Design a protein with these regions (language model features):
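Anchoring transmembrane alpha helix of integral membrane proteins
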Residues: 1-47, 53-56
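Signature of multi-pass transmembrane helix bundles
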Residues: 5-13, 20, 32-35, 66-73, ...
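Membrane-water interface of transmembrane alpha-helices in multipass transporters/channels
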Residues: 16-23, 61, 209-217, 244-255, ...
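Transmembrane helix boundary and interhelical junction motifs in multipass membrane proteins
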Residues: 39-43, 194-195, 266-274, 288, ...
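Juxtamembrane helix-boundary/capping and inter-helix hinge elements in multi-pass membrane proteins
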Residues: 50-59, 94-95, 161-167, 175-178, ...
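Membrane-interface alpha-helices at helix entry/exit sites of multi-pass transporters
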Residues: 59-66, 182-186, 281-296, 325-327, ...
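Helix-loop-helix junctions within the multi-pass membrane cores of secondary transporters/permeases
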Residues: 257-339, 393
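Transmembrane alpha-helical segments and their short flanking loops
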Residues: 309-399
Length: 399
Protein backbone atom coordinates (compact mmCIF):
# COMPACT_ATOMS: atom_id res chain seq x y z
CA UNK A 1 0.00 0.00 0.00
CA UNK A 2 2.74 2.46 1.04
CA UNK A 3 4.89 1.37 -1.91
CA UNK A 4 2.08 2.20 -4.34
CA UNK A 5 1.72 5.69 -2.88
CA UNK A 6 5.48 6.28 -2.95
CA UNK A 7 5.86 5.09 -6.55
CA UNK A 8 2.91 7.21 -7.63
CA UNK A 9 4.38 10.34 -6.05
CA UNK A 10 7.84 9.60 -7.51
CA UNK A 11 6.58 9.29 -11.08
CA UNK A 12 4.31 12.29 -10.58
CA UNK A 13 7.14 14.48 -9.27
CA UNK A 14 9.44 13.47 -12.15
CA UNK A 15 6.73 14.24 -14.71
CA UNK A 16 6.56 10.58 -15.81
CA UNK A 17 2.95 9.90 -14.87
CA UNK A 18 2.38 8.23 -18.26
CA UNK A 19 4.52 5.31 -17.03
CA UNK A 20 1.99 4.68 -14.27
CA UNK A 21 -0.97 5.07 -16.62
CA UNK A 22 0.42 2.83 -19.36
CA UNK A 23 2.39 0.18 -17.45
CA UNK A 24 1.31 0.05 -13.81
CA UNK A 25 -2.39 0.93 -13.77
CA UNK A 26 -3.35 -2.02 -16.07
CA UNK A 27 -2.32 -4.46 -13.30
CA UNK A 28 -4.89 -2.81 -11.07
CA UNK A 29 -7.48 -3.14 -13.82
CA UNK A 30 -6.68 -6.86 -14.06
CA UNK A 31 -7.24 -7.21 -10.30
CA UNK A 32 -10.65 -5.52 -10.54
CA UNK A 33 -11.58 -7.78 -13.47
CA UNK A 34 -10.63 -10.87 -11.45
CA UNK A 35 -12.94 -9.75 -8.65
CA UNK A 36 -15.77 -9.28 -11.15
CA UNK A 37 -14.99 -12.65 -12.74
CA UNK A 38 -15.54 -14.62 -9.54
CA UNK A 39 -18.51 -12.64 -8.18
CA UNK A 40 -21.38 -14.57 -9.83
CA UNK A 41 -20.06 -18.09 -9.08
CA UNK A 42 -19.38 -17.15 -5.45
CA UNK A 43 -22.80 -15.57 -4.93
CA UNK A 44 -24.63 -18.56 -6.40
CA UNK A 45 -22.86 -21.41 -4.60
CA UNK A 46 -22.54 -19.55 -1.28
CA UNK A 47 -26.23 -18.71 -1.14
CA UNK A 48 -27.25 -22.23 -2.13
CA UNK A 49 -24.96 -23.69 0.52
CA UNK A 50 -26.05 -21.21 3.18
CA UNK A 51 -29.74 -21.88 2.63
CA UNK A 52 -29.37 -25.65 2.24
CA UNK A 53 -27.48 -25.77 5.56
CA UNK A 54 -30.72 -24.74 7.22
CA UNK A 55 -32.13 -28.25 6.80
CA UNK A 56 -31.08 -28.67 10.44
CA UNK A 57 -33.88 -26.31 11.37
CA UNK A 58 -36.34 -29.16 10.92
CA UNK A 59 -34.59 -31.01 13.73
CA UNK A 60 -33.90 -27.96 15.87
CA UNK A 61 -36.92 -25.86 14.95
CA UNK A 62 -37.15 -23.74 18.10
CA UNK A 63 -33.43 -23.13 18.42
CA UNK A 64 -33.10 -22.58 14.68
CA UNK A 65 -35.97 -20.11 14.38
CA UNK A 66 -34.69 -18.08 17.32
CA UNK A 67 -31.14 -18.09 15.96
CA UNK A 68 -32.07 -17.10 12.40
CA UNK A 69 -34.41 -14.36 13.64
CA UNK A 70 -31.67 -12.84 15.80
CA UNK A 71 -29.08 -13.08 13.02
CA UNK A 72 -31.39 -11.35 10.54
CA UNK A 73 -32.39 -8.68 13.07
CA UNK A 74 -28.78 -7.77 13.94
CA UNK A 75 -27.77 -7.79 10.28
CA UNK A 76 -30.68 -5.53 9.37
CA UNK A 77 -29.63 -3.11 12.12
CA UNK A 78 -25.99 -3.20 11.00
CA UNK A 79 -26.93 -2.41 7.39
CA UNK A 80 -29.31 0.36 8.49
CA UNK A 81 -26.57 1.80 10.72
CA UNK A 82 -24.09 1.85 7.84
CA UNK A 83 -26.54 3.39 5.39
CA UNK A 84 -27.67 5.96 7.93
CA UNK A 85 -24.13 6.95 8.91
CA UNK A 86 -22.81 7.35 5.37
CA UNK A 87 -25.96 9.25 4.33
CA UNK A 88 -25.56 11.59 7.30
CA UNK A 89 -21.79 12.16 7.07
CA UNK A 90 -21.70 12.01 3.24
CA UNK A 91 -17.92 11.45 3.01
CA UNK A 92 -18.10 11.08 -0.78
CA UNK A 93 -19.89 14.35 -1.50
CA UNK A 94 -16.72 16.34 -2.12
CA UNK A 95 -16.97 17.07 -5.85
CA UNK A 96 -19.19 19.06 -8.14
CA UNK A 97 -21.29 17.15 -10.65
CA UNK A 98 -18.83 17.83 -13.48
CA UNK A 99 -15.87 16.71 -11.34
CA UNK A 100 -17.66 13.51 -10.35
CA UNK A 101 -18.33 12.69 -13.99
CA UNK A 102 -14.71 13.45 -14.89
CA UNK A 103 -13.29 11.15 -12.22
CA UNK A 104 -15.78 8.44 -13.09
CA UNK A 105 -14.47 8.43 -16.64
CA UNK A 106 -10.90 8.41 -15.36
CA UNK A 107 -11.48 5.23 -13.40
CA UNK A 108 -13.20 3.43 -16.22
CA UNK A 109 -13.90 4.46 -19.76
CA UNK A 110 -15.99 1.31 -20.18
CA UNK A 111 -18.41 1.91 -17.33
CA UNK A 112 -22.03 2.15 -18.36
CA UNK A 113 -24.54 2.96 -15.67
CA UNK A 114 -27.88 1.25 -15.53
CA UNK A 115 -29.75 4.49 -16.06
CA UNK A 116 -33.33 3.85 -17.09
CA UNK A 117 -34.10 5.04 -20.59
CA UNK A 118 -37.84 5.10 -20.09
CA UNK A 119 -40.27 5.57 -17.27
CA UNK A 120 -40.33 2.44 -15.13
CA UNK A 121 -43.52 0.85 -13.89
CA UNK A 122 -43.90 -0.09 -10.19
CA UNK A 123 -43.61 -3.84 -10.87
CA UNK A 124 -40.61 -3.61 -13.21
CA UNK A 125 -38.09 -4.19 -10.41
CA UNK A 126 -39.84 -7.40 -9.36
CA UNK A 127 -40.30 -8.60 -12.94
CA UNK A 128 -36.60 -8.07 -13.67
CA UNK A 129 -35.63 -10.29 -10.73
CA UNK A 130 -36.98 -13.32 -12.59
CA UNK A 131 -34.68 -14.40 -15.45
CA UNK A 132 -36.01 -15.88 -18.67
CA UNK A 133 -32.59 -17.35 -19.46
CA UNK A 134 -30.22 -18.50 -16.74
CA UNK A 135 -27.13 -18.40 -18.95
CA UNK A 136 -27.69 -14.85 -20.15
CA UNK A 137 -28.25 -13.77 -16.54
CA UNK A 138 -25.00 -15.46 -15.50
CA UNK A 139 -23.11 -13.61 -18.21
CA UNK A 140 -23.75 -10.12 -16.85
CA UNK A 141 -22.88 -8.87 -13.35
CA UNK A 142 -25.68 -6.33 -13.56
CA UNK A 143 -28.16 -9.24 -13.49
CA UNK A 144 -27.07 -10.32 -10.01
CA UNK A 145 -30.60 -10.17 -8.61
CA UNK A 146 -31.60 -12.85 -11.12
CA UNK A 147 -28.73 -15.07 -9.98
CA UNK A 148 -29.83 -14.58 -6.37
CA UNK A 149 -33.41 -15.49 -7.30
CA UNK A 150 -32.25 -18.76 -8.88
CA UNK A 151 -29.97 -19.50 -5.91
CA UNK A 152 -32.88 -18.98 -3.52
CA UNK A 153 -35.04 -21.34 -5.56
CA UNK A 154 -32.35 -24.03 -5.58
CA UNK A 155 -31.61 -23.61 -1.87
CA UNK A 156 -35.26 -23.80 -0.84
CA UNK A 157 -35.79 -26.84 -3.09
CA UNK A 158 -32.89 -28.61 -1.33
CA UNK A 159 -34.41 -27.84 2.09
CA UNK A 160 -37.84 -29.14 1.01
CA UNK A 161 -36.48 -32.33 -0.58
CA UNK A 162 -34.22 -33.15 2.36
CA UNK A 163 -30.67 -34.44 2.56
CA UNK A 164 -31.47 -37.99 1.47
CA UNK A 165 -32.42 -36.95 -2.06
CA UNK A 166 -30.04 -34.02 -2.45
CA UNK A 167 -26.84 -35.15 -0.71
CA UNK A 168 -25.02 -35.74 -4.01
CA UNK A 169 -25.90 -32.28 -5.33
CA UNK A 170 -24.99 -30.64 -2.01
CA UNK A 171 -21.61 -32.39 -2.19
CA UNK A 172 -21.08 -30.89 -5.65
CA UNK A 173 -22.02 -27.44 -4.32
CA UNK A 174 -19.62 -27.84 -1.38
CA UNK A 175 -16.81 -28.93 -3.69
CA UNK A 176 -17.56 -26.06 -6.08
CA UNK A 177 -17.47 -23.57 -3.22
CA UNK A 178 -14.12 -24.98 -2.08
CA UNK A 179 -12.75 -24.50 -5.60
CA UNK A 180 -14.09 -20.95 -5.80
CA UNK A 181 -12.64 -20.06 -2.40
CA UNK A 182 -9.28 -21.40 -3.53
CA UNK A 183 -9.52 -19.22 -6.65
CA UNK A 184 -10.30 -16.25 -4.39
CA UNK A 185 -7.22 -17.20 -2.38
CA UNK A 186 -5.19 -17.05 -5.61
CA UNK A 187 -6.71 -13.66 -6.44
CA UNK A 188 -5.94 -12.36 -2.94
CA UNK A 189 -2.32 -13.46 -3.37
CA UNK A 190 -2.26 -11.17 -6.40
CA UNK A 191 -3.90 -8.43 -4.30
CA UNK A 192 -0.63 -6.75 -3.19
CA UNK A 193 0.28 -6.20 -6.84
CA UNK A 194 -3.24 -5.04 -7.69
CA UNK A 195 -3.48 -2.69 -4.71
CA UNK A 196 0.03 -1.35 -5.44
CA UNK A 197 -1.01 -0.55 -9.02
CA UNK A 198 -4.35 0.94 -8.00
CA UNK A 199 -2.79 3.24 -5.41
CA UNK A 200 -0.02 4.37 -7.75
CA UNK A 201 -2.69 5.17 -10.35
CA UNK A 202 -4.83 6.85 -7.69
CA UNK A 203 -2.00 9.26 -6.83
CA UNK A 204 -1.51 10.12 -10.51
CA UNK A 205 -5.21 10.36 -11.37
CA UNK A 206 -6.05 12.53 -8.36
CA UNK A 207 -2.79 14.48 -8.16
CA UNK A 208 -3.20 17.78 -6.40
CA UNK A 209 -6.72 16.85 -5.31
CA UNK A 210 -6.68 16.81 -1.53
CA UNK A 211 -10.48 16.49 -1.52
CA UNK A 212 -10.30 12.86 -2.64
CA UNK A 213 -7.88 11.89 0.12
CA UNK A 214 -9.99 13.79 2.63
CA UNK A 215 -13.03 11.83 1.42
CA UNK A 216 -11.17 8.53 1.87
CA UNK A 217 -10.22 9.55 5.40
CA UNK A 218 -13.83 10.39 6.23
CA UNK A 219 -14.95 7.11 4.66
CA UNK A 220 -12.50 5.09 6.78
CA UNK A 221 -13.52 6.98 9.92
CA UNK A 222 -17.20 6.30 9.19
CA UNK A 223 -16.54 2.57 8.81
CA UNK A 224 -14.42 2.38 11.98
CA UNK A 225 -16.92 4.30 14.14
CA UNK A 226 -19.84 2.15 12.96
CA UNK A 227 -17.94 -1.10 13.53
CA UNK A 228 -16.76 -0.06 17.00
CA UNK A 229 -20.31 0.97 17.88
CA UNK A 230 -21.62 -2.47 16.91
CA UNK A 231 -18.92 -4.39 18.79
CA UNK A 232 -18.66 -2.33 21.97
CA UNK A 233 -22.03 -0.59 22.37
CA UNK A 234 -24.82 -2.33 20.46
CA UNK A 235 -24.11 -5.97 21.38
CA UNK A 236 -23.06 -5.42 25.02
CA UNK A 237 -25.98 -3.11 25.82
CA UNK A 238 -28.54 -5.51 24.33
CA UNK A 239 -26.91 -8.38 26.19
CA UNK A 240 -27.20 -6.44 29.44
CA UNK A 241 -30.86 -5.65 28.78
CA UNK A 242 -31.95 -9.17 27.85
CA UNK A 243 -29.68 -11.38 29.98
CA UNK A 244 -28.44 -9.14 32.82
CA UNK A 245 -24.91 -10.33 32.05
CA UNK A 246 -22.09 -8.08 33.21
CA UNK A 247 -20.79 -6.16 30.18
CA UNK A 248 -17.22 -6.11 31.46
CA UNK A 249 -17.16 -9.88 32.04
CA UNK A 250 -18.60 -10.50 28.57
CA UNK A 251 -16.07 -8.27 26.81
CA UNK A 252 -13.21 -9.79 28.82
CA UNK A 253 -14.33 -13.32 27.87
CA UNK A 254 -14.54 -12.62 24.14
CA UNK A 255 -11.41 -10.45 23.88
CA UNK A 256 -9.14 -13.42 22.94
CA UNK A 257 -11.68 -14.33 20.22
CA UNK A 258 -11.65 -10.78 18.89
CA UNK A 259 -7.86 -10.71 18.92
CA UNK A 260 -7.64 -13.92 16.88
CA UNK A 261 -10.31 -12.67 14.47
CA UNK A 262 -8.40 -9.41 14.00
CA UNK A 263 -5.19 -11.33 13.30
CA UNK A 264 -6.67 -13.82 10.80
CA UNK A 265 -9.41 -11.71 9.12
CA UNK A 266 -11.36 -14.98 8.91
CA UNK A 267 -14.51 -15.96 10.80
CA UNK A 268 -14.09 -19.55 9.67
CA UNK A 269 -10.50 -19.80 10.92
CA UNK A 270 -11.58 -18.38 14.28
CA UNK A 271 -14.58 -20.72 14.67
CA UNK A 272 -12.96 -23.65 16.59
CA UNK A 273 -11.43 -21.30 19.16
CA UNK A 274 -14.70 -19.32 19.40
CA UNK A 275 -16.68 -22.48 20.19
CA UNK A 276 -14.21 -23.52 22.89
CA UNK A 277 -13.97 -20.07 24.43
CA UNK A 278 -17.72 -19.36 24.73
CA UNK A 279 -18.30 -22.70 26.43
CA UNK A 280 -15.47 -22.24 28.91
CA UNK A 281 -15.69 -18.50 29.59
CA UNK A 282 -19.37 -17.69 28.99
CA UNK A 283 -20.88 -21.00 30.10
CA UNK A 284 -22.78 -21.56 26.86
CA UNK A 285 -24.00 -25.12 26.37
CA UNK A 286 -22.31 -27.37 23.82
CA UNK A 287 -25.63 -27.87 21.98
CA UNK A 288 -26.12 -24.13 21.50
CA UNK A 289 -22.48 -23.44 20.62
CA UNK A 290 -22.25 -26.29 18.10
CA UNK A 291 -25.36 -25.08 16.25
CA UNK A 292 -25.40 -21.29 16.58
CA UNK A 293 -21.72 -20.52 15.98
CA UNK A 294 -21.10 -22.61 12.81
CA UNK A 295 -24.34 -21.24 11.38
CA UNK A 296 -23.25 -17.72 12.30
CA UNK A 297 -19.90 -18.18 10.57
CA UNK A 298 -21.92 -18.87 7.42
CA UNK A 299 -24.93 -16.57 7.57
CA UNK A 300 -24.13 -13.80 10.07
CA UNK A 301 -21.74 -11.10 8.89
CA UNK A 302 -22.87 -7.89 10.61
CA UNK A 303 -19.52 -6.13 10.21
CA UNK A 304 -19.33 -7.06 6.55
CA UNK A 305 -22.92 -5.97 5.88
CA UNK A 306 -22.38 -2.61 7.57
CA UNK A 307 -19.18 -2.12 5.57
CA UNK A 308 -20.81 -3.05 2.25
CA UNK A 309 -23.62 -0.56 2.77
CA UNK A 310 -21.10 2.20 3.50
CA UNK A 311 -18.90 1.32 0.51
CA UNK A 312 -21.77 1.24 -1.98
CA UNK A 313 -23.22 4.58 -0.91
CA UNK A 314 -19.78 6.19 -0.56
CA UNK A 315 -18.79 5.32 -4.12
CA UNK A 316 -22.21 6.45 -5.36
CA UNK A 317 -21.58 9.81 -3.65
CA UNK A 318 -18.09 10.08 -5.18
CA UNK A 319 -19.54 9.56 -8.66
CA UNK A 320 -22.46 11.91 -8.04
CA UNK A 321 -25.02 9.11 -8.44
CA UNK A 322 -28.32 9.84 -6.72
CA UNK A 323 -29.98 6.56 -5.79
CA UNK A 324 -33.74 6.18 -5.91
CA UNK A 325 -35.81 4.85 -3.02
CA UNK A 326 -36.06 1.53 -4.87
CA UNK A 327 -32.27 1.38 -5.19
CA UNK A 328 -31.80 2.15 -1.49
CA UNK A 329 -34.16 -0.71 -0.67
CA UNK A 330 -32.25 -2.94 -3.10
CA UNK A 331 -28.98 -2.12 -1.31
CA UNK A 332 -30.63 -2.87 2.03
CA UNK A 333 -32.05 -6.18 0.80
CA UNK A 334 -28.88 -7.31 -0.95
CA UNK A 335 -26.50 -6.46 1.88
CA UNK A 336 -28.68 -8.39 4.33
CA UNK A 337 -28.83 -11.27 1.87
CA UNK A 338 -25.10 -11.05 1.24
CA UNK A 339 -24.46 -11.88 4.89
CA UNK A 340 -25.78 -15.35 4.06
CA UNK A 341 -23.57 -15.62 1.00
CA UNK A 342 -20.28 -14.11 2.19
CA UNK A 343 -17.70 -16.78 2.93
CA UNK A 344 -15.80 -16.36 6.18
CA UNK A 345 -12.40 -15.95 4.53
CA UNK A 346 -10.25 -12.85 3.84
CA UNK A 347 -11.28 -10.94 0.72
CA UNK A 348 -14.68 -12.59 0.17
CA UNK A 349 -16.59 -9.49 1.31
CA UNK A 350 -14.99 -7.40 -1.45
CA UNK A 351 -16.26 -9.87 -4.05
CA UNK A 352 -19.77 -9.73 -2.57
CA UNK A 353 -19.63 -5.93 -2.68
CA UNK A 354 -19.21 -6.24 -6.45
CA UNK A 355 -22.58 -7.98 -6.49
CA UNK A 356 -24.35 -5.21 -4.56
CA UNK A 357 -22.80 -2.42 -6.64
CA UNK A 358 -23.58 -4.11 -9.95
CA UNK A 359 -27.22 -4.58 -8.98
CA UNK A 360 -27.86 -0.85 -8.48
CA UNK A 361 -25.76 0.41 -11.40
CA UNK A 362 -22.75 1.78 -9.51
CA UNK A 363 -19.45 1.36 -11.40
CA UNK A 364 -17.52 -1.52 -9.87
CA UNK A 365 -14.30 0.24 -10.87
CA UNK A 366 -14.99 2.60 -7.97
CA UNK A 367 -13.68 -0.13 -5.67
CA UNK A 368 -10.22 0.94 -6.80
CA UNK A 369 -10.63 3.96 -4.54
CA UNK A 370 -11.01 1.97 -1.32
CA UNK A 371 -9.07 -1.27 -1.86
CA UNK A 372 -5.80 0.31 -0.76
CA UNK A 373 -7.11 0.87 2.78
CA UNK A 374 -9.34 -2.20 2.92
CA UNK A 375 -7.03 -4.62 4.75
CA UNK A 376 -7.17 -3.00 8.23
CA UNK A 377 -10.90 -2.44 7.81
CA UNK A 378 -11.30 -6.12 6.85
CA UNK A 379 -9.58 -7.11 10.09
CA UNK A 380 -11.90 -4.89 12.11
CA UNK A 381 -15.11 -6.06 10.44
CA UNK A 382 -14.10 -9.68 11.11
CA UNK A 383 -13.96 -8.74 14.80
CA UNK A 384 -17.54 -7.47 14.54
CA UNK A 385 -18.63 -10.62 12.68
CA UNK A 386 -17.41 -12.99 15.40
CA UNK A 387 -18.61 -10.68 18.18
CA UNK A 388 -22.09 -10.82 16.66
CA UNK A 389 -21.92 -14.61 16.66
CA UNK A 390 -20.96 -14.75 20.35
CA UNK A 391 -23.71 -12.25 21.19
CA UNK A 392 -26.41 -14.31 19.49
CA UNK A 393 -25.09 -17.56 20.99
CA UNK A 394 -25.18 -16.04 24.48
CA UNK A 395 -28.65 -14.59 23.99
CA UNK A 396 -30.07 -17.85 22.60
CA UNK A 397 -28.51 -19.94 25.37
CA UNK A 398 -29.61 -17.69 28.24
CA UNK A 399 -33.14 -17.24 26.92
Amino acid sequence: MIAGLVVGFIFLSTDNSSVVTNWIKPWGTIFIRLLKLIAIPLVFVSLVKGISAMTDLKRLSTLGLKTISLYLATTFFAVSLGMGAVSLVRPGSVFSKSESEFYKQKLSSETVLNVPQKERQPMDYIVEMVPDNLFSAAGDNSNMLQIIFVALLVGVAIVVLGTEKTSAFVSVINATEAIILKIIDFIMQFAPVGVFALLAALVVDFSGDSAMFSALGMYAATVVVCLLFLAYVFYPVLLKIFTRNNIGDYLKAIFPIQLLAFSTSSSSATLPFTMEQVQQKLGISEETASFVLPLGATVNMDGTSCYQAIVVLFIAQIFGIELTIAQYLTVLFLTVLASIGTAGVPGASVVMTVMVMSSVGIPVEGLALILGIDRPLDMLRTVVNVTGDTFVATLVDKK
